[in-house]
Amino acid sequence: FPKVAVVALSAQGFEANPGWKITLPFLNQALQAVCYGDMLSTLLLRVRPYEAERGSANALYQYWNKKGVAFFNPKNKYADLSDTYNMDESCGNDPLTPEEATRVHDALTQLGLPDEEAKVRSFTRLTDDTIASFDALQLRDIKRKPRVGIVGEILVKFQPDANNHAIDVIEREGCEAVVPGLLDFFLYCTYNPIWRAEYLGRSSKVAWACERGIDLIEHYRKHIVKKLSETGKFILPASIRDMANSAESVLSIGNSCGEGWFLTAEMIELIENGVPNIICAQPFACLPNHVTGKGMIKELRRQYPNSNI
């Protein structure tokens, strides 16, 4: 398919990417969109196992997903793939009955959501309103369910078809799924040149630029983290520098092939945040990830005896 362009998300120039230019406005929106997507995932997975009305969490997710699409793509410049890769699709859940659908509609009406056609004027307003509505969603007053984290190779971690719908299985078995966000992977990629400059004599200018890049990326989700922490209900993303420090107790930060040390760091972060049960999912042929994933399990179990990986 010679006419099909492949756009590489790489600063190393592996692909020429003809006709594709990353502008500052595009980069700004891309970072905001990743932050918003990570936040939506965190909100949905936290409340869905406890929803008072079956289907209300998915309906609320759909509402804010549409608001997000309208905010980031007001002129329909980009194709909307949200129906193709839909996080609220649960294989094994029966469709809502008319009575259940009515109760879900009533539950969302009680939240006082803005009209679907109303424009959101700022990213801060979009995130604040989204968090507030998920925090206000009526939940069952039951004991916290066992929490199961999902980490691994970036495709297998996020794509339901690649991980055999792990989230659906976890929730069907009466547990709560926890999936760390996508933004952290980009922070991991940005952090690696800093280590290489210090220990391998690589470019100090590149390392300095990466330090500033990390500060910039972290700034994009700073307000989201603040609002999530105010609720006291949702898991918070960790600083990539803190994750690197914690991973150093198990392996060298020089392990940067594939997901590298970041894979181990995510498992440590989950365990220390009350998620001792972890699915570490890899493609069969991804040897670097088997080394820093399965290869680290023995040491993680030694340091964290309550872990179940």
Language-model features: where?
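An N-terminal assembly and electron-transfer interface module characteristic of large anaerobic redox
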Residues: F1-I309
